[in-house]
């Protein structure tokens, strides 16, 4: 739940969720549509600037969270960079196995770098939203949409109990580890099976307790919550419009220039 904690502590937390959602999604669409190195770098740097310097989120936490998608981005880019052919004509370097060559060409390397930078830009947009807007605010926003309430309520409960069950599984694993439950492969399999079965039983017990608690508080089929006060920041809205216009202009210029 570190992302939610950082979102609650962000200086941008009280800005209207709809403003931040539209802003981040607009920039995300532009970043993907532009397919431009310049736009992607501009988006990534400015989004990180907003998160760290305006939102006052610790850069250590931000970069730690960024390592999660970075691994998948690099793996995907590596797959794009590797070319397979019958000769090593335009490859910068290659390895051959029989009559097949595996290597990296100038074109494939450029494509890989472009995709990687574009992914960084897109991920930074999503992190801007997630690190400045708690899930509670997003669920509140969804309640005002055309999505049926029961779907939103199920999503809220699932989101909440993912972390509850994760905490329970961590405690069980710690207790097992303290009793040498993972000392060798055979014992590890046995301990993992016990952890899974105990977690399943506790999940059912927790669900029953939760439903009983909700009924005792007058649950009638709908979860009623107090809507938080929404701050429609004129400054942020003006900034968002200007930013989107500038990003669009850069995208159009870069597409024409082929950057």
What are these regions (language model features)?
Residues 43-50, 137-141:
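Hydrophobic transmembrane alpha-helix segments characteristic of membrane transport
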Residues 20, 58-71, 240:
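Alpha-helical transmembrane segments and their helix-start/interface "positive-inside/aromatic belt" motifs
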């Amino acid at each position: 739940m570190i992302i939610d904690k950082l979102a609650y502590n962000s200086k941008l937390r009280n800005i209207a969720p709809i403003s931040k959602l539209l802003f981040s999604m607009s920039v995300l669409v532009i970043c993907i549509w532009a397919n431009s190195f310049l736009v992607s770098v501009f988006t990534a740097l400015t989004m990180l600037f907003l998160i760290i310097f305006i939102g006052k989120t610790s850069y250590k936490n931000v970069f730690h969270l960024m390592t999660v998608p970075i691994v998948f981005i690099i793996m995907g880019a590596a797959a794009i960079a590797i070319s397979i052919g019958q000769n090593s004509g335009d490859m910068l370097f290659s390895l051959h196995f029989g009559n097949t060559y595996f290597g990296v060409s100038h074109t494939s390397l450029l494509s890989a770098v472009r995709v990687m930078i574009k992914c960084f830009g897109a991920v930074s947009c999503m992190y801007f939203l997630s690190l400045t807007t708690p899930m509670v605010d997003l669920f509140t926003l969804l309640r005002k949409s055309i999505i049926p309430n029961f779907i939103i309520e199920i999503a809220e409960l699932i989101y909440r109990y993912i972390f509850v069950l994760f905490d329970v599984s961590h405690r069980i694993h710690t207790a097992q580890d303290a009793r040498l439950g993972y000392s060798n492969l055979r014992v590890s399999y046995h301990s993992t099976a016990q952890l899974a079965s105990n977690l399943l039983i506790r999940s059912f017990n927790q669900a029953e307790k939760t439903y009983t608690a909700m009924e005792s508080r007058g649950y009638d089929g709908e979860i009623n919550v107090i809507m938080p006060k929404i701050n429609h920041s004129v400054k942020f809205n003006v900034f968002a419009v200007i930013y989107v216009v500038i990003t669009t202009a850069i995208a159009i210029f870069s597409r024409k220039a082929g950057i």
